[in-house]
């Protein structure tokens, strides 16, 4: 099993780790700041450094037995037991964090609309919603500006799975359900807990910024009809 350091600290840019396995299937570390591809968020890229050597990591994916596989494009691999420094491609990761949090804000701007699909990218992202009528682009952009300017804090907490059973409305996605079986779930909260200050709360295992101001400007690229009640909203990070 690989300890997922990003679950408790998404701002971590690098970390020391020990190699458990390294072969053609990937490099497995005992702990990592690299996010493994899942839930529509791409896996991280970066480098592993050790003893004057470097392995370029082009993708990170989930392996068996809760392992995370760091896929290297270089032939030289660190031997098991080697101490490495795992360093993220931070500009790319930070863009993905900004995008992911922006998509949670988008959910908050469309209360009650279930998410039917989505994809997160460093340059462009989108969510599909079960909506009878498309929202107005200007209204969404105004909503983004207000929420981002407010610098709402983003926090995470671990709760018992029973919380989800008693609050099924926390899950906004129809196509993907939060992983179950460990007995606990990670919630991502935007805003404060008191009534009127909570912006969004939903199960999520992805990486996020520390507050909404860190997102920066968001552009609504387009809103498309993808079926009788399916509306696709595409976003991009602004300058």
What are these regions (language model features)?
Residues 1-239:
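Active-/binding-site microenvironments in catalytic and ligand-binding cores
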């Amino acid at each position: 099993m690989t300890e997922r350091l990003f679950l408790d600290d998404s701002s971590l840019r690098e970390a020391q780790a020990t190699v458990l396995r390294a072969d053609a299937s990937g490099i497995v570390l005992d702990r990592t700041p690299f996010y493994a591809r899942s839930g529509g968020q791409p896996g991280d890229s970066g480098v592993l450094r050790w003893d004057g050597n470097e392995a370029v990591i082009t993708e990170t994916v989930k392996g068996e037995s809760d392992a995370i596989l760091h896929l290297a494009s270089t032939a030289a691999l660190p031997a098991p037991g080697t101490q490495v420094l795992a360093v993220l491609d931070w500009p790319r990761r930070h863009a993905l964090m900004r995008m992911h949090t922006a998509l949670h804000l988008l959910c908050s701007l469309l209360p009650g609309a279930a998410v039917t699909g989505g994809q997160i990218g460093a340059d462009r992202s989108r969510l599909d919603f079960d909506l009878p009528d498309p929202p107005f682009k200007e209204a969404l952009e105004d909503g983004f500006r207000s929420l981002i300017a407010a610098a709402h804090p983003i926090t995470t907490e671990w709760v018992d799975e029973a919380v989800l059973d008693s609050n099924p409305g926390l899950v906004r996605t129809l196509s993907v359900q939060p992983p179950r079986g460990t007995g606990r779930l990670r919630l991502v909260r935007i805003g404060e807990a008191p009534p009127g200050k909570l912006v969004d709360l939903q199960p999520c295992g992805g990486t996020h910024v520390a507050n909404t101001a860190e997102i920066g400007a968001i552009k609504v690229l387009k809103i498309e009809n993808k079926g009788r009640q399916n509306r696709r909203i595409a976003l991009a990070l602004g300058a």
